[in-house]
């Protein structure tokens, strides 16, 4: 695991957990990761999440599947990364799969989806997209 980009590590853990059909995955917790997972819960891509407080806080993500254990998340990909930050204005925000997916954006209003950013008329750093 690379500790350079902990958000990419979390997204990879979620992707690998869904491929191997796990019920839940665990990752070290941070405020940004909790905000991203909260957006995924609101949009229905994962069931729920818990923060286990111990010596090192751990984020438990409970994955969601359709019938016959087909993962709800088809694609989850990191866009902006530490070596190349990607910022977009509201009018430049792309759509994922013609609106079938979401883009998670870090804005001055918090971590929100692309649709919410358009409503609030804000742009920001494109963290990842999910479909």
Swiss-Prot record:
InterPro entries: Ribosomal_uS8, Ribosomal_uS8_CS, Ribosomal_uS8_sf. Keywords: Ribonucleoprotein, Ribosomal protein, RNA-binding, rRNA-binding. One of its GO terms (biological process) is translation. One of its GO terms (cellular component) is ribosome. It comes from the Bacteria. The keyword RNA-binding applies. Disulfide bonds: none annotated. PROSITE patterns: RIBOSOMAL_S8 (PS00053). The keyword Acetylation does not apply. GO terms for molecular function: rRNA binding; structural constituent of ribosome. Belongs to the universal ribosomal protein uS8 family. Part of the 30S ribosomal subunit. Contacts proteins S5 and S12. PANTHER family: 40S RIBOSOMAL PROTEIN S15A (PTHR11758). One of the primary rRNA binding proteins, it binds directly to 16S rRNA central domain where it helps coordinate assembly of the platform of the 30S subunit. This is Small ribosomal subunit protein uS8. It comes from Blochmanniella pennsylvanica (strain BPEN).
């Amino acid at each position: 695991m690379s500790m350079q980009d902990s958000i990419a590590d979390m997204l990879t853990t979620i992707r690998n957990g869904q491929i191997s059909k796990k019920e839940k995955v665990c990752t070290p917790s941070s405020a940004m990761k909790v905000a991203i997972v909260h957006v995924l819960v609101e949009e229905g891509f994962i069931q729920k999440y818990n923060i286990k407080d111990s010596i090192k806080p751990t984020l438990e993500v409970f994955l969601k599947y359709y019938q016959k254990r087909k993962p709800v998340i088809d694609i989850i990909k990191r866009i902006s990364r530490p070596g190349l930050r990607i910022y977009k204005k509201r009018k430049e925000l792309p759509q994922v799969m013609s609106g079938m997916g979401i883009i998670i954006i870090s804005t001055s209003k918090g971590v929100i989806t692309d649709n919410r950013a358009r409503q609030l008329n804000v742009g920001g750093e494109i963290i990842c997209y999910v479909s």
